[in-house]
């Protein structure tokens, strides 16, 4: 099998958009080439280059869990030219994705241990992938505690997931606001 050119982006379809806050969005991206999607593998903690053709590319973590195949998710704050262009995309639009790149969380080494995740604001997306990875493999770990804070209630990302995690009987969730 021919190896993928790391400089050639995968073509991705924006399948879903969640407005997390007024300036933060989450995109669910599906591979336009289904075969590429079936063969795509990544590990919790890796990142990618997300591109809007004609505007440039920006680097974000892959915010979804590798246990959930067929799509990837990214969460970003609208800040500069590229993220503003990304934020203007609509469901069905095409963007580019290069990756996965970078180091990973050593989740296999954590088996049988208690896990503590501490994060704040827009720094939750890099941990979200490993949190969902651990929750999808829940029997492998002892206690799971998530401590998450933000400047205000309006700045909390993944509110729907925070609510879900808080209702689970097998996770301790602590949220704070300044």
Question: What is the role of each PLM region?
Answer:
Residues 2-93, 150-152, 178:
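Ferredoxin-reductase
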Residues 5, 81-178:
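FNR/FR-type flavoprotein reductase catalytic core
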């Amino acid at each position: 099998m021919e190896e993928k050119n790391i400089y050639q982006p995968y073509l991705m379809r924006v399948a879903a958009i969640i407005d997390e806050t007024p300036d933060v969005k989450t995109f669910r991206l599906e591979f336009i080439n289904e075969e590429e999607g079936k063969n795509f593998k990544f590990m919790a903690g890796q990142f990618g280059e997300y591109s809007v053709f004609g505007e440039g590319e920006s680097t974000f973590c892959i915010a979804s869990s590798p246990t959930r195949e067929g799509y990837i998710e990214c969460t970003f704050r609208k800040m500069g030219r590229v993220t503003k262009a990304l934020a203007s995309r609509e469901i069905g639009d095409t963007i580019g994705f290069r990756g996965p790149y970078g180091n990973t969380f050593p989740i296999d080494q954590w088996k049988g241990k208690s896990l503590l995740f501490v994060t704040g604001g827009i720094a939750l997306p890099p941990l979200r992938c490993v949190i969902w990875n651990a929750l999808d493999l829940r029997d492998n770990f002892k206690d799971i505690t998530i401590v998450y804070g933000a400047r205000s209630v309006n700045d909390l990302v993944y509110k729907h997931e925070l609510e879900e995690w808080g209702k689970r009987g097998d996770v301790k969730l602590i949220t704070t606001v300044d």
